[in-house]
Amino acid sequence: MKRLVSAFLAGAMALSLAACGGSASTSTAASSAAASAAPASSVAADNDLAHIQSNGKMVIGYTVYEPMNYTDADGNFTGFDTELATAVCEKLGVEPEFVEINWDTKETELAAKSIDCIWNGLTLTDDREENMACTKPYVKNAQVVVVKDGTDYTSTADLIGKTVVAEAGSAGETTITEDADLSQADFISKAVQTDCLMEVAAGTADAAILDLTLASAMIGEGTDYANLKMVDELNVEEYGVAFRKGSDVAEAVDNAFDELKADGTMQTLADKYGLTLAE
């Protein structure tokens, strides 16, 4: 009861002060707050680079994908894209924050602003470049056919009626649906590309269509998938980084790429991870 009375008296005093002229300072404070809040809202809506820099971080959407983004044997989160993104963020004066996403819903997460960009071996396509702000190409790639050792393979026609896997929403899936032979296979989508390797290794799939960059790093002698091999190279493609449509960050990242190419950083990383830079 004492608290209620005290609260009532405090409220009455506040109203009395407002009536005696306190409203001017309150109004000024509110106006100042609104004035200071308006630019922040405008920045977030119209200027992604300033928004990212004001937050002090770039939220990067990725999936586990060696050699681009993965955790090594010592428990360190690393990879070509991980190191490159960190170097670019340093040039932009922000910290990278890596957030694991579902690759099949990557565009939705980007549009919802739960991430600032998709930076994870993203294949550049006309559709993606039309609907998102993409950087220039920075790494070369291709889609390859992976099968178990001992498999007879001469062309994609050998996979008609067979079980073929690819990551949902990936360039591999597009390759399957658009290829005259592969489109006649029994296609099963998987959450990530590494799941595709597991299916082929286990014999539950006859072949996987996935990125050359990943296959080169993860299959063959000395790897966990020593019984798998690449037998065909299909679509040649290039990787880029995607931001929201109209974002000015893509251009800033392109400028950082130019600087990192000029000082040899990108080539050093490409050599480290066995990749080929885009021209």
Positions of the model-derived regions?
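Extracytoplasmic small-molecule ligand-binding "clamshell" domains
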Residues: 42-121
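Flexible hinge/capping segments at coil-to-helix
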Residues: 147-164
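Extended ligand-binding regions for polar small-molecule ligands
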Residues: 82-91, 170, 240-277
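Periplasmic-binding protein-like
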Residues: 140-147, 212, 216, 220-258, ...
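Bacterial lipoprotein signal-peptidase II cleavage site
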Residues: 18-35
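Short helices/loops that flank or line small-molecule/ion binding pockets
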Residues: 90, 99-100, 104-118, 131-133, ...
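A ligand-binding cleft/hinge motif common to bilobed small-molecule-binding domains
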Residues: 122-130, 175-178, 201-202, 206-235
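Ligand-binding clefts/hinges and TM-proximal coupling segments of bilobed small-molecule sensing domains
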Residues: 44, 54, 171-191, 226-230, ...
